[in-house]
Structures are given as structure tokens and as C-alpha cells.
């Protein structure tokens, strides 16, 4: 910046003189001092998505308020630190999409089973649910569905509720950067070995005097509350000082606040007889919380939702899928992957249909058994809400018109539901008029002929002679499926390319499951997720999907720049590398990854499909 120069004052005076506003040396120095003080200060207001300030008196008498960018809304000019300094109460009211999904799932289950449930009614400590979790079979489940969580599940092997509390908390930047993950997993393995001889054996922790703080997590601090308790029990902190320590840990975007407690903590532990290496290790773990860690209470509430969603996925998969689709956008996976996963688990999914679909996804009989699921399951009928270009109001009119009587034709539907040509074309593109018009090309022809009739002619039938068109090839139908609804119930796109991929010696995700550790392999799939978390030190994680399932790819930083263009831009990616297949002690399933050595962008093989596939979900 210009004012960093050693001659900044001379430059400023010359600039001012050129503008016709000369400055003396003293005034110029004051301007420079002010400019330096303002460096790094935000110059705009960013609205908190769910922050509310509650006051006894009128808010505008206490804090400065200005109009927000959105019409009819106001925003406070102070941030949370300003409010805290003034002892004003701020409450963050944040939404979780999974809460909506669970409510919808309970509603669907009540209609199906004839009994109303809420969270408290879900059976506790269900063995089949934990078996599913330990297999990392958690697509769509709250919190434990990400790549990192799925990799941790077969290592941590949750078998009871508190294990889930730790699970949702340990895969966070704080515990990872603080070096808490491996010590905790090692402690769990030591306890597992102990319990082979005595099922009720408790693992002794290194310092029994800190048992109140550390016993429940096997001697490794995972939560902020534990650090507070150690500071009180081991280092002589008062409750107020421990709370200040917690607040400094919670301010994870502002570095350095924890260091003011370093000497007091280490000296206090030393005076209490703890070795210096323990104090150093503990403080390093505390520093990890500065990279974002969970309070235990937060982890408990998240674990409850993780368990509830896992139970429903395991025992009511049809209700669960319908609820997830109706709650989009949310979660880690797009609707196409949620549907693919549900179908692999035996759930029957029926297409959008103007003569059968509701606005939302619905359940349809007859009930049929699914392997491994106790209760017979209905099919899931995709809802009109999934049709791109068809608004909720138009979908509602369609359903309302259908309740008065079955549609005789596409023309009859358009007239009675008051749908214009664009809305009819949206239905046709989604293959939702098949029962009325036949195959998709015929639907598109019929939809193109529809014009909204003037009021006096809405009940007057008119038309022209039907034209018979040939049906579209499968590839074209798949293209339209993705463009119109974001998913397909036909074959996966890679099934159409499998013969060409086989000539490139590319294995499917299913075939890779039988490949031993260390083998050099090739895989190819549609890129569904890209991740490059800060805690991974530059490593990128990519998920590919083919017709048999997902393949997880690891890209080390040294190779990221070499293959950057293909890794960041490809929709269809072929990867060659070393197959990793490791099994944790006691784990039923291994953790599988493909470590990239080279890759190739094969997006061109998708043709026009590449332009309509939903983009990958990228996280940083």
C-alpha cells in the first residue's frame, strides 16, 4: 500500500496538493496514523444468519441500527464483541435441515404405521443401527456422512451413544490439530483388549486425580468442558478463570488468545506435581481447540440427531429417503446420490408422474420386504417439487385438479390445472406425462402444443391430429432426467460407458472392494465431492461415483499442482494410483482409499450430459 512507503508523508502531501487541498506536515502525519490504524478493519457489515439481540428497553435507544440490504429488515452495527462489552444478550437461532427431515420422516411413518413418534420414542442402543454405523454406511445421516467421518467410523467403532458423542466431536480441526485423535483411538483399543477378559473392565487413566475430567474420554481431552475441569482440578484455576480460558478457545477465528493462560496453566500443573511434558502436551491440545472444537453439550445434541437419523435409515429407509428429498437442499449429498444409495439398499423408487405424484415425495404400496429390514417397506414416489421449472403453486394446482377426477389427456391436464406451455414442457422434460402421452418425445410434442386458453375458452377442447414420434435412445432419456430432476432412475451414466472404460482397464467401485492392499489400480467416476480442509495441510479428497458405488480418492499436495486442471474442472475423472485397504483392530470393514498418482479428465465421454449433471459439492 502507498502509505507503507518510507516517504508516505511526502506522497500524501503531494497527492493532496494535486487535488487542490494542501496539507501541512502535522495534518499529513495524523492522516497517516489514522490510515494505519484502519488497516484490516472491516469496511462493511456482514449480517449474522441467526443472531438476535434481546433487550428490555427499545433496541434503538441502546445500539446503532441501520437498514439491511434486504427490504424491511434492519441490522445492528455492532458485532458480538461490542454487545458482550455492553453486557447485552445475543442469542444465535440457527436452523438444521435434519430437524425438518426428521419431522417429515416421523409424519410419513405415522401415516404408514399408524403410530406417532418423536425423538424420544426411537429405540435406544439398537445393535443393527450401530452395525450400520460401524460399516460407515451413513449416506444421508446427520453429521457422520462426510468423507472424514466415514473414514473414522470403522476405526472408532461406535457401539453406544457416548461413542457417537465422541465421534461427532473428534473429526474436527481442533482435536485433529491438537493431536488427540490417535491417542484416543489407541486408548479405545487398549480398553477393547481389557474387556476381552473382563467385560466391565475400566481403562486406568494416566493421572487419576484428573479422572473427573478425563475418565469418560479415556484420558484424552476431547471437549472444551474437560479443559476447564483440568484447569480447575490440576492447575488451580478459579471457575471464572476457567470460563475465560473456554472463551479464548471458543474464539477460534482469533488466534493468540489462549497464550495468555499458558504460564498460569503450566506453572499450576507443575506445582501440583504433574510433569512438564504433560503440561506441554496438554497446552498443545488446548491450542488445537483454537482451530474449532466442540463443547460436550453441543456434541450430545448432534449425536442424538446422528443416532435418530441412523435408526430411521436402517429401519425405515423409505420414509427416510422421502423426508431427505423433501428437505433439500441440505446435507452432504445431492438427491441423485441419496436415491442411488437408497436403491442399492433395496428401496423402490418410482418416477415423477403427473397422475400419481404429490407436490412432495410420497409413499406407495404395496409393502414389500427388504433384506435386513424388519418391517416391510413401501415404494417412494418422487414428488413434483423435483421438476425443474415447475413452481410449487403450479404443482399444487395440478394435484388439486387431479383430486376432482383423473386426467383424460395432457391437454385435459393443462386446461384443468391452468398450466402454461412452459410448465407443461417442464413436466414433459421430467417424463412426468408418460401415462397421458407416451414416451418423452411424444410428451414434449404434446406439451409444446399447449397454450393457456383465455378464460371463456378454458373448458372448450381443441387440438390437432396426433403425430407419432419415435422413442428416444436411453442416453437421451438419461440426459433429460438429469436436466429436469437432477437424477435418473434408469441406468447410471457410467453403465453406458462401461464397455469403453473396460478397454481402458478401469475397475468399478464394486470390483475394487476385492482388491488387496498396495495394488496399482484404475478407477473412473463422476466427481461428486471435492474437499480440501485446512486441517489436511493441502491434501485434497475427491469422491467418484460409478454405477456400483463411490470411490474415495486422496491427492497429496505434491501432485495437486501437477494435475490441478483435471482435478478441479473435470466432471468425469479417471484416476490411476495405489489402492489402500486397511482394517482397524476389531473393525468389521476396512477403510478403502485410492491414492492418486496420475489422472485424466474424461468429461468429453459424457457428451451433453456433462452440462446438466449437478456440480460436485466442494468443501474447504
Regions found by a protein language model. Name each.
Residues 1-441, 448-452, 531-535:
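Alpha-helical scaffold/interaction cores of sigma-54-like transcription cofactors
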Residues 2-94, 353-357, 366, 370, ...:
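Low-complexity, acidic/Ser/Thr- and charged residue-rich accessory regions of DNA metabolism proteins
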Amino acid at each position: 500500500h502507498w502509505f507503507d512507503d518510507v516517504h508516505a508523508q511526502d506522497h500524501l502531501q503531494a497527492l493532496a496538493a494535486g487535488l487542490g487541498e494542501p496539507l501541512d506536515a502535522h495534518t499529513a502525519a495524523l492522516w497517516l496514523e489514522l490510515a494505519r490504524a484502519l488497516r484490516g478493519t472491516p469496511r462493511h457489515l456482514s449480517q449474522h444468519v441467526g443472531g438476535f439481540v434481546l433487550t428490555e428497553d427499545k433496541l434503538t435507544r441502546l445500539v446503532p441500527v441501520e437498514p439491511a440490504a434486504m427490504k424491511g429488515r434492519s441490522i445492528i452495527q455492532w458485532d458480538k464483541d461490542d454487545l458482550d462489552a455492553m453486557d447485552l444478550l445475543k442469542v444465535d437461532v440457527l436452523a438444521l435441515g435434519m430437524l425438518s427431515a426428521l419431522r417429515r420422516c416421523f409424519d410419513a411413518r405415522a401415516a404408514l404405521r399408524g403410530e406417532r413418534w418423536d425423538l424420544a420414542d426411537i429405540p435406544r442402543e439398537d445393535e443393527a443401527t450401530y452395525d450400520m454405523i460401524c460399516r460407515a454406511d451413513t449416506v444421508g445421516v446427520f453429521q457422520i456422512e462426510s468423507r472424514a467421518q466415514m473414514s473414522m467410523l470403522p476405526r472408532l467403532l461406535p457401539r453406544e451413544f457416548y461413542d457417537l458423542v465422541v465421534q461427532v466431536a473428534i473429526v474436527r480441526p481442533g482435536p485433529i490439530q491438537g493431536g488427540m485423535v490417535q491417542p484416543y483411538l489407541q486408548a479405545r483399543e487398549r480398553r477393547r483388549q481389557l474387556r476381552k477378559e473382563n467385560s466391565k473392565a475400566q481403562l486406568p487413566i494416566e493421572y487419576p486425580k484428573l479422572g473427573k475430567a478425563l475418565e469418560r474420554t479415556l484420558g484424552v481431552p476431547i471437549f472444551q468442558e474437560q479443559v476447564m475441569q483440568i484447569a480447575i482440578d490440576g492447575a488451580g484455576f478459579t471457575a471464572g478463570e476457567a470460563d475465560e480460558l473456554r472463551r479464548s478457545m471458543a474464539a477460534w477465528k482469533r488466534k493468540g488468545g489462549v497464550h495468555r493462560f499458558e504460564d498460569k496453566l503450566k506453572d499450576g500443573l507443575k506445582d501440583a506435581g504433574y510433569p512438564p511434558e504433560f503440561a506441554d502436551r496438554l497446552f498443545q491440545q488446548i491450542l488445537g481447540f483454537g482451530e474449532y472444537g466442540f463443547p460436550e453439550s453441543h456434541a450430545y445434541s448432534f449425536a442424538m440427531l446422528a443416532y435418530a437419523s441412523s435408526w430411521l435409515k436402517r429401519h425405515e429407509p423409505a420414509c427416510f429417503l422421502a423426508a431427505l428429498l423433501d428437505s433439500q437442499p441440505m446435507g452432504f449429498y445431492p438427491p441423485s446420490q441419496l436415491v442411488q444409495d437408497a436403491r442399492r439398499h433395496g428401496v423402490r423408487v418410482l418416477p415423477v408422474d403427473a397422475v400419481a405424484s404429490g407436490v412432495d415425495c410420497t409413499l406407495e404400496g404395496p409393502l414389500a420386504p427388504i433384506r435386513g429390514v424388519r418391517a416391510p417397506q413401501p415404494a417412494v414416489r418422487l414428488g413434483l417439487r423435483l421438476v425443474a421449472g415447475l413452481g410449487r403453486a403450479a404443482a399444487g394446482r395440478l394435484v388439486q385438479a387431479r383430486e376432482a377426477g383423473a386426467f383424460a389427456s395432457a391437454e385435459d391436464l393443462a386446461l384443468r390445472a391452468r398450466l402454461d406451455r412452459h410448465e407443461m414442457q417442464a413436466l414433459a422434460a421430467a417424463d412426468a406425462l408418460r401415462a397421458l402421452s407416451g414416451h418423452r418425445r411424444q410428451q414434449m410434442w404434446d406439451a409444446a402444443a399447449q397454450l393457456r386458453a383465455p378464460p371463456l375458452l378454458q373448458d372448450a377442447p381443441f387440438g390437432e391430429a396426433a403425430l407419432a414420434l419415435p422413442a428416444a435412445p436411453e442416453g437421451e432419456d438419461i440426459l433429460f432426467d438429469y436436466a429436469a430432476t437432477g437424477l435418473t432412475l434408469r441406468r447410471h451414466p457410467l453403465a453406458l460407458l462401461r464397455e469403453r472404460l473396460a478397454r481402458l482397464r478401469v475397475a468399478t467401485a464394486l470390483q475394487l472392494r476385492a482388491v488387496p492392499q498396495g495394488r496399482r489400480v484404475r478407477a473412473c467416476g463422476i466427481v461428486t465431492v471435492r474437499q480440501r480442509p485446512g486441517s489436511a495441510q493441502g491434501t485434497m479428497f475427491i469422491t467418484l461415483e460409478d454405477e456400483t458405488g463411490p470411490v474415495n480418492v486422496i491427492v497429496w499436495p505434491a501432485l495437486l499442482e501437477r494435475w490441478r486442471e483435471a482435478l478441479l474442472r473435470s466432471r468425469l475423472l479417471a484416476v490411476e494410483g495405489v489402492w489402500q485397504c486397511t482394517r482397524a483392530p476389531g473393525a468389521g470393514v476396512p477403510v478403502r482409499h485410492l491414492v492418486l498418482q496420475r489422472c485424466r479428465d474424461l468429461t468429453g465421454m459424457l457428451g451433453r450430459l456433462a452440462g446438466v449433471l449437478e456440480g460436485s459439492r466442494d468443501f474447504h
